[in-house]
Amino acid sequence: DPIASHSATIVTTPVFEQQMAWLAAHRYRVVPLREVVAATLGNAPPIEGPAVAITADDGWRSVYTQMFPVIRREHLPVTLFINPPMISAGSAYLTWEMIAEMRASGLVDIEAHTQTHPNFNTERARRTPEAYAAYLTQQIGGSREALQARFGVAADLLAWPFGIHDAQLEAAARQGGFVAAFALGSRAAEPGGDPFAIPRYQVYETDIGARFAAVAEGFPRGRGVVQASSSRPIPSSTPRKAAISP
């Protein structure tokens, strides 16, 4: 995929493996994202550092073909934020069968990333206030309903497309049944923070060696949510792509 091969948000599999090896060598624990949510909400004690949670957005197929073998081998919990209508919609995306296999491993949690990954700033500008409110219900609440219908379990975590969120969007997420939502922000998730704007560090292909150490050690008290950038499939002749989430 020529677009993927030039994307700044791609992390190749060898680099992802190096990053995970650095965390292991420096005694970082990779914890399930729900532990971060529980600590943020005050429903559990603060996470003892150093620790990180890993997320990946968008549901690209390379998460299954490239990333999943690594997380299964290393037994790493990962949360995927997906857009339900895009699944099984083409060769670039995960299929529901792939997702079922990953969920069955007990390592992969599937959560919502809205229905179609909209830019909410753009969509607000092109709609009346009433139409925009209805659109939010469809995009936000609809994504949770689709995942709950598919898996029969609560899918109550949300990742904001492009990291865009505001008071109206957060209210729509609450009304849609979500308990927490994730943005960007390159800072640590802290107990008592806004549960609908939990920050994530975005990690890049260039974050290796000293650069990755600087990112990891910059987490206040060694805690952070790492967002694996979305990745797309690429020709087998080029380095394999994977993504990790801060």
Residue spans of the language-model regions?
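Metal-dependent polysaccharide deacetylase catalytic core of the NodB/CE4 family, i.e.
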Residues: D1-S7, H26-R29, P45-V52, W60-R61, ...
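N-terminal pre-catalytic segment of deacetylase/amide-hydrolase enzymes
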Residues: D1-V52, E217-P246
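Short, solvent-exposed turn/loop segments enriched in Gly/Ser/Thr/Pro and often Arg
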Residues: R34-T40, T114-T116, A159-I164, G185-E190
